[in-house]
């Protein structure tokens, strides 16, 4: 059977033969074969001693260059070999000898070849590493090295990979990154306090490619010839070990201890022993434990370093929990003054964890909630109290959820509702209403709400505070099934149109489901009154289904009290009852489409005009005569937007003209009744929208001016982001969205 060393040497010979071929194709093929061979056996467990063990000797040259900011109580050691000694130093740190340096070299070549794109572009530290490569061949920063192109760096990478196949080659920064990925441990790259301008690129902790929770770390130092007090030239790498390990090795060599054949302690027992007696040395336990010397001292050093950190984090987290139980969080600056070791991100992580997990009910006694301290109690009407005593599933779910989450839901719903009414609440007024919400959270919610409400218009009226809001669209007409929940007093105020404060809009104890029902009633009222076309309904109420609009629209047609008068009835009404800015003149309505002025074809029609020209009771979509028609969005300068044309064309295809050949009751007598009408309308509208969007993307892709998502969303706000990227990926993969 072939031994391990012979297999490694055969792999290196195959890689060296593949280097002679042009390009990297042959070398990558050899690397794939080498990976299969090397995967048949793994690296041995890190244990020192055995055949070929090297006596530890301090490197005086590297010790003179050892920086002050490096880990203390550590010494660089002498390592024998050829080249830059990177793999020899790593083998010495892990196994106490340099016998596995060739295997580390072969595994590094395979790692760098098979993950070439990751080390050049995909890694988080790729820019830092490439900048370090620029300076690795010089002692100071120079314009020539700074201006090296990416193609030159790729060529240097390929040349270094090919050179690594030979034992006498020199290593670079990316070899350290590849070694960290192979060994699955962190590597502390120690750089001398020379070459100050380029030192930050080399003196750093290098993490493996698969960055899991890695705690082990190797210390490797850049050593070489000192030129001046500020410059030095790198020549080789030196392994760095703890001072205790060197002393213990010297003591063990002078006073050898006879082996003890008793049972060895498992690693868990060794950790417990270290926690109880942190001053133990390896020489006292070398015969009783089953771990290596380097692992023992690394554990001892980590327990000494991390014991205080763990205690500090424990006390800081419990201090934050106690402050949360008392009714509020400690500000960040005050918290950092008390616990400077805790980072800002950790503070916010703990804060969101307490807000989301309801820690106030699970940890400690019952204390006043943050909602009770942040929002004052408001006396509720008797009707509302009775309704809440009856209870519902949504109210029970809201009571079971943490109070802080309920408060955040109310605050977010209140802000979204104000924006839907074209009212922009300033932060100072919002904070008076909800003092527990931060400024950043307010602006994040406001930005998202504005994105979901494209119909929002910034005007002077939009800057009114929450105290001046009048819910003219909410509560004027309460359905019979919901009158008990609303209460007589609240319904009376809303029906009379009296001004209502922000606390009346959404009471502190109102569950989220009731607020959604109120928005649904407002949308239903606007649709039944004919003041809300389909396009504006989709933009203003994205959470409601399109079929809901058509159901309400059909109900308004069937109700005799809500039916919109026809053209003949509208001509008999007095002229003063019509709004001049929202409706067309009777003369213009009576004109055929061909006699209208060309200017009227380029101006978008108001929603009231679109709704007023419907004279067929069975129709669900407005007729086509009232909509401006254009051949394409690009053909009419100054005309309506592309999205408006799409909606208008969809309405034309789904509606029936006054002079159409089909009877007016054809659609009403379709199979399935009103449900069938709704389904057909939804399918036709959605298909038309998607077809227009696909055609737009396909034309822009063919003209090599593909739009960004922001531009696409402005033209097609009803299309989801995922759908845009799905179509974009299909186009770039060579597929066709629409044939013809």
Swiss-Prot record:
Region annotation Disordered: where it falls in the sequence: 485-506, 560-616, 653-673
UniProt feature, compositional bias: Basic and acidic residues: 578-604
Primary location: nucleus
Membrane-spanning intervals of the chain: none
Entries under CDD domains matching the protein: OTU_VRTN
Disruption phenotype: Deficient homozygous mice exhibit delayed embryonic development, impaired somite formation, failure to initate turning and lethality between 10.5 dpc and 11.5 dpc. Mice heterozygous for the allele exhibit kyphosis, decreased thoracic vertebrae numbers and missing rib.
Compartments where located: Nucleus
Any one annotated GO CC term: nucleus
Swiss-Prot/TrEMBL keywords: Developmental protein, DNA-binding, Nucleus, Transcription, Transcription regulation
InterPro entries: Vertnin-like, VRTN_OTU_dom
Record field: compositional bias (Polar residues): 653-667
Keyword Transferase carried by entry: no
A biological process from GO: regulation of transcription by RNA polymerase II
Single Gene Ontology MF annotation: DNA binding
Protein role: Acts as a transcription factor that regulates development of thoracic vertebrae.
Protein name per UniProt: Vertnin
Source organism of the structure: Mus musculus
The encoding gene: Vrtn
């Amino acid at each position: 059977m072939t031994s391990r060393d012979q297999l490694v040497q055969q792999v290196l010979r195959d890689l060296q033969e593949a280097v002679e071929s042009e390009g990297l194709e042959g070398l990558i093929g050899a690397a794939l074969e080498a990976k299969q061979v090397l995967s048949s056996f793994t690296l041995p467990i890190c244990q020192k001693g055995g055949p070929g063990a090297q006596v530890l000797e301090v490197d005086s040259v590297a010790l003179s260059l050892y920086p002050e900011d490096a880990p203390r109580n550590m010494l660089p050691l002498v390592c024998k070999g050829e080249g830059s000694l990177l793999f020899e130093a790593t083998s010495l740190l892990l196994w106490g000898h340099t016998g596995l340096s060739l295997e580390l070299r072969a595994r590094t070549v395979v790692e760098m070849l098979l993950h070439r794109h990751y080390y050049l572009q995909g890694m988080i530290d790729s820019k830092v590493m490439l900048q370090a490569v620029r300076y690795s061949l010089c002692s100071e920063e120079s314009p020539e090295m700074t201006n090296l192109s990416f193609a030159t760096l790729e060529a240097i990478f390929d040349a270094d990979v090919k050179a690594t196949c030979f034992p006498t080659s020199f290593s670079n920064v990316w070899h350290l990154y590849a070694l960290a990925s192979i060994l699955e441990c962190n590597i502390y790259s120690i750089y001398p306090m020379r070459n100050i301008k380029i030192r930050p690129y080399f003196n750093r902790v290098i993490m493996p490619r698969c960055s899991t929770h890695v705690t082990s770390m190797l210390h490797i130092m850049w050593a070489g010839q000192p030129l001046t007090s500020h410059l030095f030239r790198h020549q080789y790498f030196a392994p760095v070990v703890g001072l205790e390990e060197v002393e213990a090795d010297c003591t063990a060599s002078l006073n050898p201890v006879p082996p003890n054949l008793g049972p060895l302690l498992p690693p868990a027992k060794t950790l417990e022993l270290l926690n109880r007696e942190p001053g133990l040395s390896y020489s006292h336990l070398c015969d009783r434990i089953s771990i290596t010397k380097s692992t023992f001292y690394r554990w001892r050093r980590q327990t000494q370093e991390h014991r205080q950190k763990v205690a500090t984090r424990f006390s800081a987290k419990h201090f934050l929990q106690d402050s949360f139980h008392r009714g509020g969080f400690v500000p960040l600056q005050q918290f950092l003054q008390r616990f400077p070791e805790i980072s800002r991100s950790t503070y916010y992580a703990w804060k969101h964890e307490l807000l989301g997990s309801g820690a106030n009910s699970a940890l400690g006694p019952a204390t006043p909630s943050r909602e009770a301290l942040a929002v004052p109690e408001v006396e509720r009407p008797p009707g509302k109290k009775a309704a809440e005593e009856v209870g519902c599933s949504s109210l029970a779910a809201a009571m079971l959820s943490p109070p802080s989450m309920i408060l955040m839901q109310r605050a977010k719903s209140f802000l979204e509702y104000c924006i839907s009414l074209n009212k922009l609440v300033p932060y100072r007024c919002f904070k008076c209403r909800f003092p527990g919400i931060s400024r950043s959270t307010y602006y994040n919610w406001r930005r998202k709400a504005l994105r979901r409400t494209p119909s929002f218009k910034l005007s002077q009226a939009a800057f009114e505070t929450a105290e001046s809001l009048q819910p003219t669209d909410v509560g004027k007409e309460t359905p019979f099934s919901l009158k008990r929940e609303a209460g007589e007093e609240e319904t009376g105020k809303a029906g009379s149109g009296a001004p209502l404060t922000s606390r009346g809009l959404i009471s502190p104890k109102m569950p989220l489901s009731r607020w959604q029902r109120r928005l649904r009633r407002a949308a239903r009222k606007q649709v039944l009154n004919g003041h809300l076309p389909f396009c504006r309904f989709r933009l203003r109420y994205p959470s409601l289904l399109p079929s809901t609009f058509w159901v309400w629209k059909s109900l308004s047609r069937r109700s005799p009290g809500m039916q919109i008068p026809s053209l003949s009835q509208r001509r008999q009404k007095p002229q003063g009852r019509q709004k001049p800015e929202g409706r067309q003149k009777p003369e213009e309505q009576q004109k055929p489409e061909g006699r209208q002025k060309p200017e009227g074809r380029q101006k978008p029609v108001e929603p009231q005009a679109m709704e007023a020209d419907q004279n067929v009771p069975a129709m669900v979509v407005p007729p086509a005569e009232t909509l401006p028609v254009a051949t394409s969005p690009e053909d009419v300068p100054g005309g309506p937007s592309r999205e408006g044309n799409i909606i208008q064309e969809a309405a034309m295809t789904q509606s029936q003209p006054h002079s159409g050949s089909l009877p007016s009751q054809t659609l009403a007598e379709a199979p399935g009744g009103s449900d069938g009408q709704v389904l057909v309308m939804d399918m036709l509208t959605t298909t038309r929208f998607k077809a227009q969007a696909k055609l737009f993307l396909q034309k822009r892709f063919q003209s090599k001016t593909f739009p960004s998502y922001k531009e696409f969303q402005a033209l097609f706000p009803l299309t989801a982001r995922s759908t845009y990227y799905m179509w974009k990926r299909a186009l770039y993969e060579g597929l066709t969205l629409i044939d013809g």
